[in-house]
Amino acid sequence: MDKEKTLLTLNSFNKNTLMETLKIEFVDVGVDFVTAKMPVNSAVHQPYGILHGGATAALAETVGSCASALFVDTKTKIIKGIELSVNHLKSKKEGTVFGIAKPIHKGRTTHLWEIKVVDENEQLISICKITNIVLDKK
């Protein structure tokens, strides 16, 4: 896997999407993980001035779905998230959070990923799981 080329490809998918709005950027990829970062500021706050759970969920779904896409032939297959769970463990007011997706199961038709959302000090903010379905392109 060409890491730099893969990161460029992943980041190219963000243009004109929610990921671009949230400033999500893929920053690392390996044989068994994908990492993306998102800034925490007023743009992703909820009314109490902390990171909105929906923004965290968007980061988790983004990194988990894109991780699945790395393991299929995207010329013939598409990935769709069918379940997302997010447990928020700690709040975050400002800085950066990182979504790190690691596989739990990579089957022929379904993938299950664990996504840990941590801050720049490696404090666990949220723990997430996403189930993706692998479908034939029509």
Positions of PLM-derived features:
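Terminal targeting signals and extreme-terminal segments of soluble enzymes
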Residues: 1-138
